[in-house]
Amino acid sequence: LHAPHDSGAYHRSRRTVSALMKQGAQVLIDVHRDSAPAQAYRTEINGQQVARVKLVVGRRNPNSSANLGYAKKVKAFLDQNYPGLAKGIFVGRGVYNQDLRPTSILLEVGSNQTTLGEAKAAVGLFANTLPEITGINPETGARQVSQTADEGSNWRSLGWLIAAVIIGGAGYLLIST
């Protein structure tokens, strides 16, 4: 979506993120692919070969503690519902635009060696978990549990989040293959 992937990519994507936040997005997920051997990122879930995902949190921003807590919540939920999908949490040196929201993560979906189909399958599984992680019922749009404003506000936010993950992920996956 924000090609080329160079030192200016986060500056360019920041405009998109800011626009999504103005429309009500409460959770930010930046989708990438890692550079690693396929076997490091390949697993089988429910009989289907999928790419594994790694959650990345930047430590050089004021939201790093909150983002790490959010990443731990997401990983725990993935581990419970799709064992083996989450490769782990990596705390990196960057900011990754995570200074914009305390519910931000960078998601490495497979590697440049896993297939586009495996990556799409992983994004689909991850997207399936978003309603429960954010506490929003996908059928009614209502909150399922009491939450703070930082954890999600409404169905529209979830819709924008899912759209951003799918569009950004698909765009990046197409560019990187």
Each predicted region: which residue ranges?
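Catalytic-core regions of hydrolytic enzymes
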Residues: 1-40
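Second-shell loop/turn segments in exported
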Residues: 2-11, 16-18, 56-65, 108-118
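Extracytoplasmic/secreted proteins, especially bacterial periplasmic and envelope-associated proteins
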Residues: 12-19, 66-73, 77, 118-121, ...
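Generic structural signal for short, solvent-exposed loop/turn connectors between secondary structure elements
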Residues: 21-26, 59-66, 131-145
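Membrane-proximal low-complexity regions enriched in glycine and acidic/polar residues
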Residues: 26-108, 112-113
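Active-site-adjacent mobile loop/cap segments within catalytic or ligand-binding domains
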Residues: 88-144
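Juxtamembrane/start-of-transmembrane alpha-helix segments at the extracytoplasmic/lumenal side
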Residues: 145-166
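C-terminal membrane-anchoring or membrane-association module
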Residues: 166-177
